[in-house]
Amino acid sequence: MSAPIAEAVLRYAGLGVAPFHTPGHKGGRGAHPLLRRFLTDEGLAADVSLSAELDDLHAPTGCIRAAEDLAAEAYGADAAYFMVNGTTGAVHTMLMAALSPGDTLLVPRNAHRSIVGAMILAGVRPVYLQPEVDQRLGVAMGVSLETVRRAAEAHPEARAALLVYPTYYGVATELGEIATFLHGRGMLLLTDAAHGAHFAFSDALPPSAMAAGADLSAESTHKLLGSLTQTSMLLARGGRVAAERIRAAAGILQTTSPNELLLASLDLARAQMAEEGRTRLAAVIPLAEELRRRVGEIDGLWTLGAEHMGLPGMAALDATKLTVQVMGLGMTGFAAEGVLRQRDIACELADARNVLLLLSYADGAREIEHLFAALRALAQEHPPRCTARGEGTSFCTLPPLPQTVPSPREAYFAQHECVPIGDAAGRTAAETIVFYPPGIPVLAPGDAIDTETVAYLRTMRRIGARVVGAADATLETLTVIRDL
């Protein structure tokens, strides 16, 4: 299977050319010994930056263009754009290319913090959508077709909808039906498919965003496939957003010195999945489903499965995501995460009720047995406090949708001040406050702060959630727009 970027980089590195160009470590000979240990001599020799010989990410005509074309073919897209600033960069590029300042965007409240940043950059005005909430898990799921329909009819000025597909927990909404509805109104469908880059390579997974009809889709190739961390792709289909706009926006937002190792890893990840992705996913998915069944039989634990799908906003589930509720053990997900780490298991995410564990094409029976043994030991060490599975008293209730008066951009650039959290209700937020993971904003610039949100912030802080984005990480104070 051809990998044009990787082949071009290795070809140049093997020429033995004296490098009187960047980077300064000169093919690795000047690198720190530990860096040489991390990347090896061969890897450092491949860290080159000759756009004249190795193509230019911002105006590709050679190996990068060939690799992007192969990626588009593999994903069923019209075009693919390689991103070295992660899916955050892809999301920013997507909004900058598709929308203009003042445009209205339908966006779920459980969108990633990168979307708030993109709205600030693009000057977009959000209409927030309430996602469906699974009461068993206490977390937001997908946005239903009916919710999108109501919002679009209430806001006929909306130019696009940006949906999370799938959610962090692997839940996919009825995206194909939503695409048909939006396109019928002349609207764009944009997707944050950070956790759906593998969907294109298995019929046992939900349809890919491209197959479902998305116009643009930001996909984290590194999250569940084989490229290096911080590499992603922006996929386009249908021609509703001009290619030159996408390339121009990417040129503004991405570095002019992209690392060839990162680009080559995207190229190789695509080649690997195009050649053997279906076979490897076909091997791990049954293992994941069997693991889910076995864990669900452990007293005190409950797992989200395909049998719980079929509701609005919850059309299908990614089998490679294992959500385990630990409330039956009388503990939070944060506490369970710590216990599992002591058994050499690192979780992807913990929240008030659950831990989330990701499986990928790289996992096999040995890794899965290790995980099962750790979960079984967790339950044995913490006897069940209740017999009900998937039920129980909520640790905290998600706050209601905020009112947004100034746009995120207007709020970001307004005059700010810090106030005690007890005095924040009735003020307008000027910062993004996120509990991470999953990176979903509780407050974003422009949000009206109410008492429910203040209570939620205090509760999440008390139970050990990690705060990101706040000027005061203790949440004793909040940054708000200064009253004039």
Give residue ranges: language-model regions:
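Charge-dense polyanion-binding interfaces
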Residues: 466-484
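Short acidic/polar alpha-helix capping motifs at helix-coil junctions
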Residues: 30-36, 79-82, 114, 143, ...
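Conserved C-terminal alpha-helix-loop-beta "cap" of PLP-dependent enzymes
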Residues: 290-470
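Structural signal for conserved beta-strand scaffold positions within catalytic alpha/beta enzyme cores
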Residues: 82, 128-130, 219, 349, ...
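Conserved N-terminal alpha-helix of the aminotransferase class I/II PLP-enzyme fold
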Residues: 44-89
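N-terminal "arm"/small-domain region of PLP-dependent enzymes with the aminotransferase-like
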Residues: 1-61, 438
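Conserved PLP-enzyme active-site core in the AAT-like
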Residues: 5-10, 16, 77, 87-307
